[in-house]
Regions:
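Short, charged recognition helix plus adjacent turn
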Residues: 2, 10, 15-16, 35, ...
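The alpha-helix within a helix-turn-helix
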Residues: 12, 23, 52
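Helix-turn-helix DNA-binding elements, focusing on the entry/boundary residues of the two helices
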Residues: 19, 30, 45-48
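Residues in the helix-turn-helix
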Residues: 21, 32, 61
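Recognition helix of helix-turn-helix/homeodomain-like DNA-binding domains
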Residues: 28-43
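DNA major-groove recognition helix of helix-turn-helix/homeodomain DNA-binding modules
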Residues: 46-61
Length: 73
């Protein structure tokens, strides 16, 4: 069973963007983005919306599909 909630690291790689770039866009500490990318912490919903707009993806693209399914049960 997968424990990763978000796919931020994967989406950043797909978009050829770095953690540093994202932290500059969001004006957050680099360690915060690093924690999100390793799934040791999660962005709040407001930040998730900002990230999706910055990266030009749907919020669902940032979340692990297995995690989404567990929310729908």
């Amino acid at each position: 069973m997968e424990t990763d909630i978000n796919r931020l690291k994967i989406v950043l790689a797909e978009k050829k963007k770095t953690n540093k770039w994202l932290c500059e866009q969001l004006k957050v500490n680099p360690s915060t983005v690093s924690k999100w990318c390793t799934n040791s912490s999660q962005p709040d919903i407001e930040t998730l919306i900002k990230i999706s707009k910055i990266l030009g993806v749907e919020i669902e693209d940032l979340l692990n599909k297995h995690y989404i399914k567990t929310l729908m049960i």
